[in-house]
Amino acid sequence: MLNNKVRVLSLIGAALVARGAFAAGGGDCNRACLEGIADQYLDAMVAHDPAKVPIAPGTRYTENGVQLPLPDGLWRIASSVGKYRLKVSDPELGEIGFFAKATENGAPILVATRLQVVDHQITQIESVVAHTSDLIGGPAGQARPDVLGDAPRPQFLQALPPGSQRGRQEMIDIANTYWTGIENNAGTHPPLFADDCNRIENGSYTTNRPVAPGAEPNGGNYSCKQAFDLGYYHDDTRLRDRRYMVIDRERGLVYAGVGFDHDATIRSYTVKNGKTVKITRTAPWTWMIHEIFQINKEGKISQVEAILLSVPYGMSPGWDTGVHIPDPSALKDGYREVH
C-alpha cells in the first residue's frame, strides 16, 4: 500500500493549488504553448539575451540551488543547445520541465530546467546543470551527454491510452515509491517497477549494464527491480525536499526534484547476494537531482532519467513549493520518512 501520509499531504497540496498558492497560469497555455516557450528559453539562453523570451518582471532564477540575476551563470557562457530535449508538460498548472544537451564555453553539459508560465510569461526558472566534471560515481564516471543521442527514449514521447491516464495524486504516489524505496534501502520497500524499467543518470545507463570482463556485478548491472531487491543504495541515508513539480498526465510523466543526502556514517554494507559494497567517499555529501519518471499504462515505473550533481551536504534546492513530501509529522530526525 502506498504511503498514506504522502497521500494526505499531497491532497493538502492539491487544495493549496486550488487556492492559487501555486502556479496560477494553468489552462491558458497548452502543451504546444509550453513546449514552444521552453524552446524559446533555450534559444535565448544561448543568445545570452533574456529579452528573446517572455520573462515576467521579478522572475526568480536559480541555478544549482543558488539564486542568480538574469543573465548570469549558464546564461553568460552557454554556447549551443543540442537536439536532445525531453519535455514534461503540465498545462493544468502552467508548468514545464525539460532536460536538454548543451555546451558551455564549448564543453558538453546537461541541463534540467523547470519553468512556471503565467499568462504566457515565465515567472519561475529553476535549473540544475551537470557539467562534464560532475562525477556520478562508480563505473559510470563523468556526465556523458553524448550517450543520449538526439532524441529521448520513445516511452517518454508516447501518449497513454485515455483509459490508462491517471490522476495527479496517483502519479505522485507511484513516483514516491521510488524515493521511499531507495532511502536506506534494504530491499524492504520495493518501488512499483515495470519489468522493462531502465534508468539513465547524467547520460549513463545505471541499470542493465553488461558486466565488464573479469569484473564482479555491481548495482548498475541489474534491472531496476533487482538492484532494489538486493539492497543496493543503502548508503543513501536521507531523501529530502521531495518535490513533484510537473505532472504530465497525458504521457504518464512526473518531473521531480530531491536531495539525496549521504551522511558518510555507512562505510560499507552487504547486499542480499553476499556482495559487500564499500563506500569510498569519506565526507558527507548531497546529490541535487531533477528526475523524470515515466509511468506506464499498468501504473508502474518504466523509465527513469536524472540530471544530478554533487553539492554541499544538506544544501537546499532553493525553492519551497508549499508541498513537503514526506510530511514533517512523519519524520524521525526532521528529514527522514518513517516506514
At which residue positions do the language-model features occur?
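Preference for short coil/turn "hinge" residues that link or interrupt alpha-helices
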Residues: 9-10, 48
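Bacterial N-terminal signal peptides that target proteins for export
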Residues: 1-9
